[in-house]
């Protein structure tokens, strides 16, 4: 039963979706890749090194609570999910001009967000920004809604060390489906118009997709089907990554 265990969410529990007012975005403090980390390293300031497990968050620790199921080796787990809803290639035009709206709306409805802030990024590439530039490069684990680990870290993800398929939606339900990505396994953008940067659902524009059931590079770019890419009028799911 994929819904029996939940890892919690980006906020406390709740049932409302994002409201119609302005939405705040959270900042990663610069380029992705600066997350979390190792505890116990010597301090350069002469202060005692952080000790993971002492209950005190210090140094490069993101968390330090033995009772927190989302804290692993003093680095916070990041939730990932595949959307329960499908979109066509023009989803940017109906989602308040924000590529991340659907991820955050569904997360809010599922109780993963209650503070009206965008806490998830869509794994999608555009002509100006690749998926790797969009999502947070965590030193910690990317975890599914059922508690299973998708990848141990950003580095593991880039090495295609996929432990479990990213086939669980925001409601903890299994969903094996095609997913729009336009993204290579290394996170860079595939060539093409990206459905005119996600503003076209025309049959004569194309988009590359991944397979949520895959546990290898096919998760983001499925190569086992001659119909990849497909036309942008096809409906497909999206991947969502908690950031930061």
PLM regions: where:
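Ser/Thr-rich, Pro/Gly/Ala-heavy low-complexity intrinsically disordered linkers and tails
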Residues: 1-53, 63
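Extracellular calcium-associated, cysteine-rich motifs in secreted modular proteins
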Residues: 48-76
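Secreted/extracellular ectodomain signature
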Residues: 75-244
């Amino acid at each position: 039963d994929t819904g029996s265990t939940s890892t919690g969410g980006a906020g406390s529990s709740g049932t409302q979706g994002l409201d119609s007012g302005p939405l705040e975005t959270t900042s990663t403090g610069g380029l992705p890749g600066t997350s979390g980390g190792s505890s116990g390293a010597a301090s350069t300031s002469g202060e005692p090194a952080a000790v993971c497990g002492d209950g005190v968050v210090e140094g490069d620790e993101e968390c330090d609570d033995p009772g927190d199921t989302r804290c692993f080796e003093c680095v916070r787990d990041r939730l990932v999910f595949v959307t329960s809803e499908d979109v066509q290639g023009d989803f940017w035009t109906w989602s308040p001009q924000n590529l991340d709206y659907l991820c955050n709306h569904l997360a809010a409805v599922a109780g993963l967000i209650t503070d009206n802030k965008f806490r998830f990024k869509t794994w999608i590439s555009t002509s100006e920004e690749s998926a790797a530039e969009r999502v947070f490069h965590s030193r910690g684990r990317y975890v599914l809604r059922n508690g299973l680990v998708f990848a141990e870290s950003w580095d593991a993800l880039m090495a295609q060390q996929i432990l479990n398929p990213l086939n669980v939606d925001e409601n903890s339900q299994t969903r094996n489906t095609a997913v729009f990505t336009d993204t290579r396994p290394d996170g860079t953008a595939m060539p093409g118009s990206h459905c005119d940067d996600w503003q076209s659902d025309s049959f004569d524009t194309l988009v590359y997709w991944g397979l949520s059931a895959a546990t290898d590079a096919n998760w983001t770019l499925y190569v086992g089907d001659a119909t990849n890419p497909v036309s942008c009028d096809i409906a497909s799911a999206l991947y969502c990554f908690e950031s930061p």
